[in-house]
Amino acid sequence: MYDDFLEALKDNHFEEIPVDARTFVEGEDFLGQPGLSDIQYDIVEAMSQIYRKEDLIEFMGEEEGSQYYDKYTKNEIILQLGKGSGKDFTSTVACSYIVYKLLCLKDPAKYFGKPSGDAIDLINVAINAQQAKNVFFKGFKTKIEKSPWFAGKFYAKADSIEFNKSITVYSGHSERESHEGLNLLLAVLD
């Protein structure tokens, strides 16, 4: 009984325990996509590692959580892959996974030390408006719309998708400067 009391006092930030990247990508309840290559899974894991070390240890155990944190926690990722290697596809998967992981939190803004309910923004910036709309954003939007897990948790607009908990993914391009003032967690430069 005392252990239950201590467990209740713990600062649990999660509304739902997130699934691993492979389950998220391939699972019918999530994206339901074909499996990725090992390199693509590593890219997705590195791009989407947003959790604190202590939370990873709680989910995965001391050794695995620490190793995961050390391997995948990055501030910047540069993909230098050839044409047709799946950079845009992998980026849309990673962005989807980040949004999923944010929505698993009770209050994503508070988790990152921001005021409760504060905006969290993710953006893809392409060279021009057509590329912004037809490459990354189209693939991202399709994944979200087809995923049973995201049903009822978003509102799609022409150049953005607003999710519950004040999370927004924007499609931008370098021809305009309206991206100032965003609370960016992720920026994908295409």
For the regions a language model picked out, list residue spans one by one:
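Phosphate/NTP-binding elements of NTP-utilizing enzymes
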Residues: 1-190
